[in-house]
Amino acid sequence: LVASIAINLSRLGLDLPWAFNRKEKKDHGEGGTIIGSPLTGRVLIVDDVISAGTSIRESIAIIRDNGAIPAGVAIALDRMEKGGNAEEVTETSAVQDVEKTFSIPVVSIANLTNLLEFLKSGSDAAQEFTSHTEAVTAYRNRYCA
């Protein structure tokens, strides 16, 4: 996801450094968990989805540990899940919790409400997926803020 964003920004004349973190540290090749440019200055976190916000919190810790500043978060899909953890669930969303806790903006391309609107739209593009509407609605009723 980050590489495709960097490519498109480059096409717009914006040559920005980028990096990503591996889930597991490797002891060969480049080693470590950060691949790409060193983390310096203000860093935008890019992720495919936000659920509880755990990976965002981990990314913020990695950025700070490297002396950089988390500037914001861009995500493809906000699942609109309640924030908190296994012991304590909040009534606010994980996105709202991240924004409040770290004082950074979180923006998404789409959220679960958008997905449900698409599934219920009756459009030709949605026809293949309408069978999932009930399951997505049940998920939203159970887990979302």
What is the meaning of each model-derived region?
Residues V2-V43, T54-R57:
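Short, glycine/charge-rich flexible loops or terminal/linker lids adjacent to PRPP-binding catalytic cores
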Residues I5, I50, A110-L112:
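A broadly conserved detector of short glycine/acidic/proline-rich loop/turn motifs that flank catalytic sites
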Residues N21-E24, D47, L77, I109-N111:
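Fold-independent oxyanion-binding glycine-rich loops
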